[in-house]
């Protein structure tokens, strides 16, 4: 017996779908949060104390650790501003 249960294909005629209704295939391009970002985070690298609060609170985990500061991956950052609001030094904006 197979571990996976197979399901019958959906039958349009049995479901009563009109013949003139044509299903259309849609191509969806992958869209990252950074593609629709409204704000861009900026870090004052001289004043960053590397507390990692921005890294901890980022909902999309776009904060990247470097030797002396944290930076943001702008491809995944959605511009929500949580990092700036949570930063105790207010070094990201």
Curated annotation (Swiss-Prot):
Regulation affecting activity: Activated by magnesium ions and thiamine diphosphate.
pH dependence as annotated: Optimum pH is 8 when measured with benzyl viologen. Half-maximal activities are obtained at pH 9 and pH 6.8.
GO biological process: L-phenylalanine metabolic process
Gene3D superfamilies: 3.30.70.20
Residues annotated as signal peptide: none
Enzyme class: oxidoreductase
Ranges of residues in domain 4Fe-4S ferredoxin-type: 39-68, 66-93
Keywords attached to this entry: 4Fe-4S, Iron, Iron-sulfur, Metal-binding, NAD, Oxidoreductase, Repeat
Keyword Acetylation: no
Gene Ontology terms, MF aspect: 4 iron, 4 sulfur cluster binding; metal ion binding; NAD binding; oxidoreductase activity, acting on the aldehyde or oxo group of donors, iron-sulfur protein as acceptor; phenylglyoxylate dehydrogenase (acylating) activity
Catalytic activity: phenylglyoxylate + NAD(+) + CoA = benzoyl-CoA + CO2 + NADH
InterPro entries the UniProt entry points to: 4Fe4S_Fe-S-bd, 4Fe4S_Fe_S_CS, PadF, PorD_KorD
UniProt cofactor note: Binds 3 [4Fe-4S] clusters per heteropentamers.
EC code: 1.2.1.58
Cofactor(s) needed by this chain: [4Fe-4S] cluster
Inducing factors: Induced anaerobically by phenylalanine, phenylacetate or phenylglyoxylate.
A Pfam family annotated for this UniProt entry: Fer4
Subunit structure: Dimer of heteropentamers composed of an alpha (PadG), a beta (PadI), a gamma (PadE), a delta (PadF) and an epsilon (PadH) subunit.
Chain's role: Involved in the anaerobic metabolism of phenylalanine and phenylacetate. Catalyzes the oxidative decarboxylation of phenylglyoxylate to benzoyl-CoA and CO(2). It can also react slowly with 2-oxo-3-methylbutanoate and use different electron acceptors such as benzyl viologen, methyl viologen, FAD or FMN, but NAD seems to be the physiological electron acceptor. Also catalyzes an isotope exchange between CO(2) and the carboxyl group which proves partial or complete reversibility of the oxidative decarboxylation reaction.
Descriptive protein name: NADH-dependent phenylglyoxylate dehydrogenase subunit delta
Source organism: Aromatoleum evansii (Azoarcus evansii)
